[in-house]
């Protein structure tokens, strides 16, 4: 394979992995530990 193809595949896998981790953090099990600043602020 050419170097450019491998670089594109590597960057694509990195992007998909980062997106999956971000979705897991936002909506998965760790989301219960996230704080909500709007809930904490009393008007």
Curated annotation (Swiss-Prot):
Pfam families: PsbN. GO terms for cellular component: chloroplast thylakoid membrane. The keyword Transmembrane helix applies. The gene is psbN. Keywords: Chloroplast, Membrane, Plastid, Thylakoid, Transmembrane, Transmembrane helix. InterPro entries: PSII_PsbN. One of its GO terms (biological process) is photosynthesis. It is found in: Plastid, Chloroplast thylakoid membrane. May play a role in photosystem I and II biogenesis. Belongs to the PsbN family. It is a single-pass membrane protein. The chain crosses the membrane at residues 7-27. This is Protein PsbN. It comes from the Eukaryota.
């Amino acid at each position: 394979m050419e170097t450019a193809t491998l670089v594109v595949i590597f960057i694509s896998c990195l992007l998909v992995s980062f997106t999956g981790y971000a979705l897991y953090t936002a909506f998965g099990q760790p989301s219960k530990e996230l704080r909500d600043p709007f809930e904490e602020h009393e008007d």
